[in-house]
C-alpha cells in the first residue's frame, strides 16, 4: 500500500517545470486488476503498478493513478480514473486513450530526482539508477510524463528499459505488423474492431458502406484502368518487372511509352541508378505526360540513352511535342535540408518560451526554413503545371534515385491538375501509385528502425503542401484537414503495410521469410497481406470517419429535386464564390510577382534548369503571362488550381503542429467553428433533399433511416438525431491535448502565451548521462 502523498523531491529537473507538490494530489485508486486491450499477436513484455500520469506541470490535482504497460506494439497506461477537463475524445479503435505506438516514440528520458541524475535511454543500454520519472517525447510533438514515486524501484527500471528496447528495433521483422499478420494467418477467424483483419478488399471507408474501392496498383488491371481514365493512348502497361526481375525498387507493373519494346527496356535498365528506368505517372487531356526517372549512371551511354528515351516520350504525344526535363536535385532542397528544417520547426513549436521571444516569433519561424521549403515545392510544381498545360510539353522529373523528391513533386502536380486526386479515393490512389508502389522509402524516411541518418519528413511535407492548397481552395477538396492529420498519424502506427516498407519488393521478401520461419502457408500469395491504412474502419467508427468529409466540397455535379424527382444540376465550368476564394487586390498577391517567381537571396529555390537547354527567357515570360491570366479569372474548382505563394498565403499547419499544445488552443475558435456551421448547413440540405426524394415513394417515416446515414459529423437537428455536437470545440478539434502533453493546466490561455511551456526535446549532449 502506498501513501496518499509522495515524498517531496529534492531535485528539480530542468527537463520540464518542476512537479507540483501541493496537498491536493489525487488520491490513490482502489487496487483492482487492470488489464490492457490487446490486438492479435500483441503481448505484454513488462508492466509496473502504482504509476502516476502527470496531466499538467503546475499542479498534480488532475494526475491519474494506474498501471503502465509496455507491449510489442505500444505503451499503455491503464486507469479507472476519468480524464479531467476533457469533454471530447477522438478515439482511435486500435489505441486506448493513453496509448502511444512504439514507432511514434522519438526519445525516452529517465530521471532520478533524489540523485540528480537523468539519462536518454537507447536500445540495449543499462540504467544504473532507479528512475522516479519517465518522459516520452513523441514524433507527433506529444509529451507524456509518468511518475514512479509509489512504484517498485526495480519494476520501474525494467519497464523503462523495455520501452527503450522495443521502441528502437534493429530488424524489420521485429515490428508489430509481422506478429499481427502472423497471428491472423494462423487464425483466419480473427477480426479487429468487428472488421476482418485481412489485407484483401481495401475500401476508402471514409463514410458510407458503399465507398469506392481504392486501387492499390499491385495488378496490371489497376494500371490499365488509370491509363484509360487519363486517355494515355501512346502508353502501355509493362510487365517485364514481374517477380522484380529487373528492379527491386519499382513495382511489378508500370507504364512506359508504347514505342519502347520490352527488350530495349531491359537493356536500358542497367544504365539507370537502381535500374529505375523512366515510368509514366499521368497524362493531360492535351496529350502531354508526366514521367519520372532516375539518373543515367553510365556516362558513356548517357547521351544515347537519354535521346532514345526522349524520342519515345515524344512519339507518345499526339502532337509529337518536345520533352522538358526538370532536374529536381538542382531545383529543390535535398532530404537532409528538409530534415534539418523540420527539427528546427519541432524545437520552435514545442520548445521555445513565447513570452521571451514573442516579437521574434515570425522571424524564428522563418529561420527554420520549413515554410520556405513548402513554398519551394508548391512553386516548382506550379511552374511544371504551366509546362504541361500551356506549353503542351511532356515533363520528365529527374532525380538521382528517383524515389524521394520526385514522389512529392509528381503527386503535387497531379493534385493541382486532376480533380479526381482531390477526392478521398483519388487521393489515396495517388499515394499508392506515386509513393507506395513507386518505392518511396517509408521504413527509412519515417525512421521506424531508428536509423536517424536516413530520416526525412518528405511525406509530411507533401501533406503540408496539400493542406496549403486545401486552405486556399476549400471547395475543391472532398477531404478535410482532419483526414490529412489522421493520415499523418497513421504513418507512425506499425500495423499498416502501406507505410512500413521501402518498396513492394521488400514487403514480399521480408514477409515471405517471416512466413517460412513461422510455418505459414502462403499458397499463391506473393508474401503476407498486411492491413492497408485505407481500411479506415480498423481505426475509426463510421461516425468518426464522417470528420474526413469536407462540408465546403463542391462535387462535379450535385443532385437536386424538382417536383419530387431527382435531377442532376451541372455547375457552370467557372463556378466561383467570393467566400471561397478572394480575388487579389493586385496581381502582386498572386504567384506572378518577382518575389514569387524569382529566388530571393540565400534561398534554395532555383529557377528551372531544363536539360537539354531550352528557351528559358521566353518560357519565363510565357509562364508569367499564364499565371496572370489564370489569377485574373474565377477559379475552376473542377479543373486546375494553382497556389498563391506570397507570405500571407503560405501558412503554418496549426492543427498538425500545435494540436497537442493547450496554450495554442482557441476555445470555441479557429476554423472548426466555420466547419461546424457549414456541416450543419450541408447536413440540413442533404436531409431535406432525401426527404423530398422519398416524398412520393412512401411514408415520411421511411426516409428517417436514410437520414441517419449523414455524411457530416455535425448534424442538423432531426427526428432521430440524438448524438448532438461535442460540448467543447477548440482550434485543436478533434484532438484533445489534455493528458497527452505535460503543459499548463489552464486551457485556452491568451494568444500571447501561444507557445509558452516547458523546455523539451533535449539532445543527448544536453543531458548529463550520469550512470
From Swiss-Prot:
One of its GO terms (cellular component) is cytoplasm. Gene3D superfamilies: Pleckstrin-homology domain (PH domain)/Phosphotyrosine-binding domain (PTB). Keywords: Phosphoprotein. The modification Phosphoserine is found at residues 603, 745. Residues 217-657 form the Myotubularin phosphatase domain. It holds the Pfam family 3-PAP. InterPro entries: MTMR10_PH-GRAM, MTMR10_PTP, MTMR12-like_C, Myotubularin, Myotubularin-like_Pase_dom, PH-like_dom_sf, Prot-tyrosine_phosphatase-like. Belongs to the protein-tyrosine phosphatase family. Non-receptor class myotubularin subfamily. This is Myotubularin-related protein 10.
